[in-house]
UniProtKB/Swiss-Prot annotation:
Enzyme Commission number(s) from the entry: 3.4.21.92
The encoding gene: clpP1
Biological source species: Chlamydia caviae (strain ATCC VR-813 / DSM 19441 / 03DC25 / GPIC) (Chlamydophila caviae)
Location in the cell: Cytoplasm
Pfam families per the UniProt record, alphabetical: CLP_protease (PF00574)
UniProt-listed GO biological process terms: protein quality control for misfolded or incompletely synthesized proteins
Catalytic activity reported: Hydrolysis of proteins to small peptides in the presence of ATP and magnesium. alpha-casein is the usual test substrate. In the absence of ATP, only oligopeptides shorter than five residues are hydrolyzed (such as succinyl-Leu-Tyr-|-NHMec, and Leu-Tyr-Leu-|-Tyr-Trp, in which cleavage of the -Tyr-|-Leu- and -Tyr-|-Trp bonds also occurs)
Molecular function via GO: ATP-dependent peptidase activity; ATPase binding; serine-type endopeptidase activity
Main location group: cytoplasm
Oligomer status and interactors: Fourteen ClpP subunits assemble into 2 heptameric rings which stack back to back to give a disk-like structure with a central cavity, resembling the structure of eukaryotic proteasomes.
The protein's name: ATP-dependent Clp protease proteolytic subunit 1
Sequence similarity: Belongs to the peptidase S14 family.
HAMAP family, alphabetized: ClpP
SUPFAM superfamilies per the UniProt record, alphabetical: ClpP/crotonase
Listed GO CC annotations: cytoplasm; endopeptidase Clp complex
Length: 191
């Protein structure tokens, strides 16, 4: 299929998905992917305020700041958002899966969820004072993430802090039992 036809088909598919009031987030959480998701979410919000939106997540995680940008925008909308994990919601992807109101957080049966504490990638260099600033900032970020998991699950702080000490992988059923999900979704008709 020539490139022009592929792009045209992609546009038709994207329009059909948006017409169904669904936003797919199937990539790492970056500034660009977050901006794209926010634009689609607000397009749906402004087109038909208050109408339900389904936010489908399959993400290995990524930028905490970009993820919280999506989180904050969803919380500001009047449209009720339902999150559906399909495949993987790891790291910041798992946090995004919790931006829906209680009762609106689902996963498909074979999905996996991974929670952990935030990390800094790459070599860190700089003056001791700068390193201290970075250390304090990542601890603030860890607290924000712990608070999200606390609010979503109702688990005690000690349980959450222990759970995220290392990568904690869960099946959809395990994530539901832990309080990260409200249910397992077998069909979009069940929403």
């Amino acid at each position: 299929m020539p490139d022009g036809e592929v792009n045209k088909l992609r546009d038709v598919i994207d329009k059909k998905i948006l017409d169904a009031r669904r936003v797919f987030f199937s990539e790492p959480v970056t500034d660009k992917s977050a901006a794209d998701a926010i634009k689609k979410l607000w397009y749906l919000e402004l087109s038909h305020p208050g109408q339900p939106i389904v936010f489908v997540i399959n993400s290995p995680g990524g930028s905490v700041d970009a993820g919280f940008a999506v989180w904050d925008q969803i919380k500001m909308m009047t449209s009720p958002v339902t999150t559906v994990v399909t495949g993987l919601a790891a790291s910041m992807g798992s946090v995004l899966s919790l931006c829906a109101a209680p009762g609106r957080r689902f996963a498909t049966p074979h999905s996996r969820i991974m929670i952990h504490q935030p990390s800094i990638g790459g070599p860190i260099t700089g003056q001791a004072t700068d390193l201290d600033i970075h250390a304090r900032e990542i601890l603030k970020t860890k607290k924000r993430i712990v608070d999200v998991y606390l609010e979503a699950t109702g688990q005690p702080r000690e349980v959450i802090e222990k759970a995220i000490d290392r990568d904690m992988w869960m099946t959809a059923d395990e994530a539901k039992d832990f309080g990260l999900l409200d249910g397992i979704l077998f069909s979009f008709d069940d929403l």
